[in-house]
Amino acid sequence: MVALSVFVRQQPKLSNLSFVTFSEFFSSIITAQRASYWGAFFIAVLSPGFLLGVTQPSHTHSVQNPIGTATLEIGTCDSNGLAGGTCYRAVVSGCPEASSDFAATVKINEPADLNSLKGTVFFTTGGSGQALYDYDQDFIGDSRCSASNCGLMTVQSINAANYRTVQVDFVDPEGVIQEPDGWLTGPATDGPRSLACRYATIVHAVWEVLLKRDKTHLVCATGNSGGGALLAYAITQYGMGNGSGPGPEFTMIETTSGPPYGRIDQGCAGTAAPVSTVSCPPGAQLSEDYGLTTAADFVDPAYSSDVCTVDINSNGTDPYPYFHHDSVLSDDDPAPSYKTFVRSLFGSEDLTAAVPLGLEWYNAITSSKSAACVTGAPHELPEDFDGASTIVTDITTTCK
């Protein structure tokens, strides 16, 4: 194997530093079991070295999250999905709050005519991202797509339009590193927000090493549900939407069916979660409540304990204190503005909390954006022929 290493790492600014003893203490507090949280807190404030009279926990956050480092090793693609690709094993290290290295598969397909290259498009799948877009079982089933694989149709059509396609699968291709929950494998104090560092680092590594920091051609991306959340975190918390991050700066992203982490604090609030009237499907009233299954599968694994499940069972009376901060629409950026054009798609058959939670973020964006409703499309929007066709049209007409 040929190893290509990326040594560029964005460092937090000095202005984000605080009193270390105090910060480290409370970072450890919020990783403890929730049942012992306040007991540990009151013991601490009565102990030597801590100030008396403090009544609220504190945790130091950076407005912009730093990325880690990555290596890319050339591997072998399997026979599924789009033929002619080159696959890499990406190993990410140094992401703050991630306790160990993380590995993922990166599959790249060059267009037939590189001289007519229009740009590069990244693809991520939903949930914990443990599949390539061109062979995700959730995107297979609509007979109107070739081989009933609409994910493959999407990638293939965009590649045929002279775009380089880059797919990310958050599973170690060598099976060495155990990642049961894909990119959401924790624990992390700041949950999905911190763990999205893995995606941002991989995107940067591909751009830095393989694309040679190419600023001549555009970089765009699409992702469904949790995969769309990775794009939203990248342009918001990792600076890839306004030039403040390590690069690249996305020209356009298309989130489909989300992002479901628009407001985690509201998604984990149980019956206290807001109910919104949405336009897709027209006039439907949808709760932002994740429900216990989604909480257990796609929120709790990012933390050190079942914090979302606990909050749902309490109907919002026992919240994890940093859910709002950990959201895409966070308390440190309530009115996001990007140089990146944001396009959001929803399906009329999607009645999940991802719709109103995704709209929480979309509606707060103050920069250039647009949204659309795909009639008949489910939450797994790229599984639907019309949904997949809309993605292809949007990217090939907007990413240019």
List PLM regions with ranges:
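Short, surface-exposed "cap/lid" segments of acyl-processing enzymes
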Residues: P111-I158
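Alpha/beta-hydrolase active-site loop
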Residues: P187-R213
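Cap/lid segment of the alpha/beta-hydrolase catalytic domain
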Residues: T165-S194
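A fold-wide structural signal in alpha/beta-hydrolase
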Residues: T120, N159-D169
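Serine-hydrolase catalytic core
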Residues: A295-T375
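Catalytic active-site module of serine/aspartate enzymes centered on a nucleophile-bearing elbow/loop
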Residues: D384-K400
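Primarily recognizes the serine-hydrolase "nucleophile elbow" in alpha/beta-hydrolase
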Residues: T216-S276
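N-terminal cap/lid segment of alpha/beta-hydrolase-fold proteins
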Residues: V63-S116
